[in-house]
Structures are given as C-alpha cells and as structure tokens.
A protein has these predicted regions:
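Accessory RNA 3′-end/elbow-binding domains used by RNA modification enzymes
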Residues: 1-18, 24-41, 45, 49, ...
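RNA pseudouridine synthases
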Residues: 2-187, 191-217, 288-289
Length: 310
C-alpha cells in the first residue's frame, strides 16, 4: 500500500463560511484552493448559517478534536409565530401562533432570555447529524420517520438581546448567545418560543467566535491559496490554550521518535503547572506533551511541524 505523501501545508485556518453551503462544501473548496487532500474542520455549521469555521490542514487536522470543546458564540435572529420541523427557516411550518403584544416588549424579552441561562438538558432538533442506531437523525426525519432524540446536557453562558424587530404578523429577536459544545441554537429558539407560549424558529444565524477564534480572524475561501495560506495561519498554541515551550533544534530526532525529554532542556522558563505543553522547534509546533517525573512525555508528535506559531 502506497504511503501518503506528506502535506506541504500544516496549519489551522479561520474561514468565514458563507450562507448556502455545507461545512463539507467549505472543506472541499479549501482542498482545491490549497492543493491539499488532508483538510478537516472543527464544528459543523448548518447551510443557512455563516461565520467562524476553523479548518485544519495537514498535521493540524489532528488538533481539531481538541478545539471542538471550546465555547461558541453566535448572533441569531429568532422569528416568532411559526415553529418548523427543522427549527429554522428552511423547514416546513408545523405550528402557527399569533404574535402576542408582549413579544415586542424589551423588558419581557430580556426576562425570557435571562431564564435560559445556565446548565440544562436540551433535546436536539430532529433534523440534526446525530446518529440513531447508525443512521443520521436528519435522514430518518426526511423519510418521514419519527425521531426521538434523548436530551443532552448543554449550558447557555450568555443570551443578550440586541434588538426586537419585525412588523405586522412578524416579531424577530436578535440575540447574541454564548454556549457550550453541542448546544443547538435552533433548539434554543424552539424552546424559547414554547416558553413564551408562542412558536419560534431561527431565521438567520452567524457564528461570531469559536473558542478564542473570532470572526475578525476569518477569511473568505476565495482568499486562500497555497501561496497565501501561511499569512492567514492561526497560532495553534493560542487556539489550543496550551503553554509554549521552546526546545533546541538538536532535539528534533528525539521528538520525532517520541522520546521523553528532560524539562531542563527548555530554552526559557515557563509555567510548569499549565498543561498541555506545546513543544516548539525552529518556530514550528512539533509536539504536545505533559510533564511526569521532570520529563516531557509526548502525547502527540507531528512529523511535519504545524505552522502559525507566534
């Protein structure tokens, strides 16, 4: 079996996903733009959503599972009066309720949003990528089958009202959310509508941050190329929240072989209490490690250094 050719690009990138395409579409576009096959992403966005999408290229794809634990931030338009089978504007209406006057009251809106804060059990939307007996929930839902998803623990850290709009039979709350991993904003809108004795769905959604990566760090896929990518690379150590440790270049073979390295070989002082430790050689991220018995013990070794370290 032929061995995979090492990636020429190894980095994290922040892409501003446009409305109308899937997360997989963005990955495919990045593969073509960068001429790299090994590309993945951290955290799916629905086709109708836009915003922050962290993409891993080459060795950096191995970091993606560590990034999905991060807090996510969104700005959402929540439209009242209609609940849909997908909990967003792309679905079919399943329940319609006249818009009550109090929904336009700012104090009432803030009170209802405040009640959403904190840990809670959330039932995901039926149209979601969660697997049920090996089948994606959205596939079963599209076939007309009843989808019964168990509630999952999530947490809403912030739900700040930005505006109340809409005219006539419509009322729209624009809300800035900060939530834990696995929280569905569509489900929050659905549950908010019910809590207000109404019906609601998401009519627009934009992810504004994923962990420490904000929308200001993002670039359109059209801006990316194999030549320009290095200038757009995210600092992988900052994205992971790791502690940087610089090591001398003559330890490259030891790192590549996964050998333990004495802590005193570090080129500068660092906080030994703040794991994980990002081991840097010649300006590139070569490994992630923990400390045991005064030595760095390798947890992840990257044969090709991950770029973007600042």
């Amino acid at each position: 079996m032929a061995r995979r050719t090492p990636s020429q690009l190894n980095m994290l990138l922040a892409v501003d996903k446009p409305v109308g395409c899937t997360s997989h579409d963005v990955v495919s576009q990045c593969r073509r733009a960068l001429h790299e096959r090994r590309v993945g992403h951290a955290g799916t966005l629905d086709p109708m959503a836009s915003g922050v999408m962290v993409v891993g290229v080459g060795q950096a794809t191995r970091l993606l599972g560590m990034l999905t634990l991060d807090t996510k931030s969104y700005v959402a338009d929540i439209s009242f009066g209609v609940e849909t089978n997908t909990d967003d504007a792309e679905g079919e209406a399943v329940r319609t309720v006249p818009v009550a006057p109090e929904l336009r009251d700012l104090a009432y809106a803030r009170e209802q949003l405040a009640a959403m804060l904190g840990p809670q059990m959330q039932v995901p939307p039926a149209f979601s990528a969660i697997s049920v007996n090996g089948v994606r929930a959205y596939k079963s839902a599209r076939e007309g089958n009843a989808v019964d998803l168990p509630p999952r623990p999530v947490e809403v850290y912030a739900a700040d009202l930005i505006a109340v709009g809409g005219e006539g039979d419509t009322c729209v709350w624009t809300v800035a959310f900060s939530v834990s991993k696995g929280t569905y904003i569509r489900a929050l809108a659905r549950d908010l509508g019910r809590a207000c004795d109404s019906a609601a769905h998401i009519s627009a959604l934009r992810r504004t941050a994923s962990g420490v990566v904000s929308i200001g760090a993002c670039h359109a896929v059209e801006e990316l190329s194999a030549e320009s990518a290095a200038g757009f690379a995210l600092d992988p150590i900052a994205a992971l929240g790791a502690t940087r440790v610089d090591l001398p270049g003559n330890l490259a073979d030891d790192l590549l072989c996964g050998r333990c390295i004495p802590v005193e070989r570090a080129l500068a002082d660092f906080d030994t209490a703040k794991a994980p430790f990002a081991l840097v050689l010649d300006g590139g991220l070569k490994a992630l490690a923990r400390i045991e018995g005064g030595r760095f013990v390798m947890e992840h070794v990257f044969p090709q250094a991950i770029g973007g370290v600042r």
